[in-house]
């Protein structure tokens, strides 16, 4: 029975009904008048279908509801208005209900993914409501239910996910222990891979951890204040985060009696967060999370600490301008697979303190360089994204081409093994190859079951291979042999009737028919029954053709139904292989990253760093990898530099001109240290790196308008974080600290901060400054040393040598840099004149008291300075005014009109002088 949709009629109109069949979905069903989203006072005015809609929508009030009607997803009322605005689709209003216009909008089912992707990117969540009943047998509305909820943190479809970055759903919960200590528990899940991680930290560290993990969606409790986030946020009741329930839920998910082997002992708030996370994820997917088969507990002491400022300033995966290139990741990412690209991104954001694993990675890279990584990388390029396909298998949402891609990838694994030689000197490489263990049963099943080139979706058929199921083969034979039957029937009927132009054909609307032109109508036999009349012909059906039609069309429908049944069974049969497929995916991703880093090291002339226990950073001929790459594109050589930091040389005071390369030198040192801790080779001739626990950067600054903080406040906040947290094993980069306030305040702060870093933190520090007074610091602290970026003057210009040399710089060359930047010549000349006056005042005048940091202070006006200059000069005032006016004139840049105006000004000055 077809499903009818009826609505209250607007005044003066009749109630409209329409069949909700796929054939009418794009016409009648899309134009139906529907009731208000709020449940109407008089339920009898609503159709059964709209009552069904309101009931389902009531369970999902905060999400957009995609309500399946034939070949469309419909949105009604407020959802329709919101979707129309966000997606730029048509919003219709047809009729009224209770005086309110009835709004609706829709999107085609076959293109839903692109609309979902746009909504998720905007932070919206969408409930997908599908028809699960059969319209042909339903009495009343077709049965529907929400089969999944798409949220920013629970994406698994390939069309919705970024290829080269992970999407995390994170739950955070704060808990106070019996001793009154507040702990913050984090649990985050990559639903597209099944990777689950837990961590506990102090509340003060929450912002840093969120910056590291960068979740797409955060679950949190009522009343909890979250740091400023750009991701989606979902508030859940407190009881969702119950620790005991969370522990139970996690044990059930992993299938173990105890969580101790996973390192969960002592965790509290994180277990509550894990319970909320798993329940939320399972609810959105509408089923269990079979691919989440383990948990990893992270400790703060495991990774080299990188706060948000450091990640931003080092431009690991995003530039300061917010673009993806040029960054360290964009330079390194030549990965053959998207799995490898995601793993590489993770490695760069998670450098390790313990040198054991980085050293093992570097050994594997060395072995691959010796073997030559090109052959392996060529094989890896043929592989599919096994990690995400496995997740979709576990969620029973894999599509036919996922299965064919998985089959082809498993077939190629022997080639991967053959292209890589295990080495005793590279145990990690040997371990990785062992983990690429081909699941033969899984491969054989896929070979038998899946067609060589299956259709995109199961409803189109052609997915299950021939020979896999005899019943399906028989049904296919019936429907596929129609052509030959029609040819044979047409031949027989022409001979029987004598109608030479008789045709036997088929179309979707009228089925099978025999067509006879009007001129041959007198020859039509009595057993022909008219099916359709055309202008110049008649179409007929015979008992034989009708019997075949029933059989053929029935066979096609039954074949599609059988194929869907077999496909569902195939997905179930593949579930036991989820664990082995996840291990293979992890090993392939790791191998791809190692091969990529080997190729990069070989191509870019990088070296394997030496990791030692001594607290030292000793880099010979180090280079900034990204800047070097940019210069190479312009055929310009990068100037390499050395950097030595040790117990006797803890702080380098770096002076030199703007644009001389101070910031580049500092950043390249940090990047070399980070790459060594990641396990990559490094851009240097030689690098010896000791223990590193954190990397801090205080480089550049900008107003925090949203937070109400000035540039100087941002600068001091970051400096305070460094002074409170840096240790002797930390690397600190300080660039022009104190520049955001008055000269003496800034100098005093810079001096005190440098002294504190030397005397208290004792960190490895690169301290760039334009305060030349700081170059006297090594007199008080022998652990400090002066270096400078050299430059030479050439005429009125300057040539930057970009070479780091011992000792302080002689000057900053600020005016020369301003000239290079295109500052007008009159301004440059005025600046030179004023600089000379300032230097004279500095040498001769008594010092003026320095005002307090927050006090207003004024500097002499230009007029005052000119008066002072004139007063100290023997030149008469009138002559001085003439000379100054002449100095401001650039004859080569004047137009004729400007030259004439300048001449009039000089004449005016002369006349004024005579009058005086």
UniProtKB/Swiss-Prot annotation:
Domain of life: Bacteria
GO MF term (any one): ATP binding
Disulfide topology: none
Name the UniProt record assigns to this protein: DNA mismatch repair protein MutS
Pfam families: MutS_I, MutS_II, MutS_III, MutS_IV, MutS_V
Keyword DNA repair: yes
Gene3D superfamilies: 1.10.1420.10, 6.10.140.430, DNA repair protein MutS, domain I, MutS, connector domain, P-loop containing nucleotide triphosphate hydrolases
Positions with a binding annotation for ATP: 656-663
Start and end residues of each stretch annotated as Disordered: 1-47, 843-880
SMART domains linked to this entry: MUTSac, MUTSd
Cellular component, GO, one term: cytosol
Bias type Polar residues, positions: 843-861
CDD domains linked to this entry: ABC_MutS1
Family listed: Belongs to the DNA mismatch repair MutS family.
Designated gene of the protein: mutS
Keywords recorded for this protein, A-Z: ATP-binding, DNA damage, DNA repair, DNA-binding, Nucleotide-binding
Its job: This protein is involved in the repair of mismatches in DNA. It is possible that it carries out the mismatch recognition step. This protein has a weak ATPase activity.
Ranges of compositional bias, category Basic and acidic residues: 30-45
One GO process term, biological-process aspect: mismatch repair
